[in-house]
Regions:
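A generic, well-ordered mixed alpha/beta core segment in the N-terminal half of proteins
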Residues: 96-106, 110
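Helical "lid/coupling" subdomains associated with nucleotide-phosphate turnover
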Residues: 3-39, 44-96, 111-211
């Protein structure tokens, strides 16, 4: 369920009451599914939004009244590791893979083989954070787009050499943002429903956005 806690971070990095209530309501709807899980097999974690939120402890205290176990705020690389494990258990072994997960406040990139992550990284670039930083008015233009690309390249430059040297055979996107991009390329006729998201499709999407 889409909650987008990161969208509820105000200018002081505090979660707004509305964002907290969205998150708590989601947890209340979800908690019933946890009743069949043994407590010793259950781990409840929070990621970037609560890592960033100065008042994250308030949300965790409220959530403790709903959940069977306390929330653990995990580091970015641990988030990346867990993402990789989740993806690897849903796919056939296909050599070395790069897994990309674009979240609301951060993006995780992991290179691994089978069930073993080799390189894990979490970068401060997410779809909600970039929307607020570069497209706050809901408009995409050349200037704002180029600023967003520059910021993303700056983040990626910190890991580019390591990841290029490690190499990969396939790329897997695990986030809603990537799924949305693929669906748009299908709807626009730039790829068919059986194809993966391609660089060609992304380039066409980029060009159309910049012309809008």
């Amino acid at each position: 369920e889409k909650v987008q806690l990161a969208a509820g971070l105000d200018e002081n990095k505090n979660l707004t009451e509305a964002a907290q209530q969205r998150g708590l309501a989601c947890l209340a709807r979800f908690v019933g599914r946890l009743s069949a899980v043994q407590p010793n097999r259950l781990r409840i974690v929070a990621t970037n939004a609560l890592r960033q939120a100065k008042n994250g402890h308030e949300f965790i205290q409220k959530a403790a009244e709903i959940l069977p176990k306390p929330i653990e705020i995990i580091a970015g690389r641990e988030e990346a590791r867990l993402i990789y494990l989740g993806v690897s258990h849903t796919m056939e072994n296909s050599g070395r893979r790069l897994v990309i997960d674009i979240g609301g406040g951060s993006t995780e990139l992991i290179i691994g083989e089978e069930f073993e992550p080799i390189h894990t990284e979490s970068l401060q670039m997410g779809c909600v954070a970039y929307t607020k930083a570069f497209f706050a008015e809901g408009e995409i233009n050349h200037k704002s787009f180029d600023k967003a690309v520059f910021a993303a390249r700056k983040e990626l430059s910190t890991i580019a050499n390591t990841y290029k040297n490690a190499g990969w055979d396939t790329v897997v996107g695990s986030s809603g943002t990537i799924k949305a991009c693929r669906q748009i390329t299908v709807n626009m006729g730039w790829s068919n429903a059986q194809e993966n998201l391609t660089r060609e499709g992304l380039e066409k999407l980029k060009d159309k956005d910049r012309k809008s």
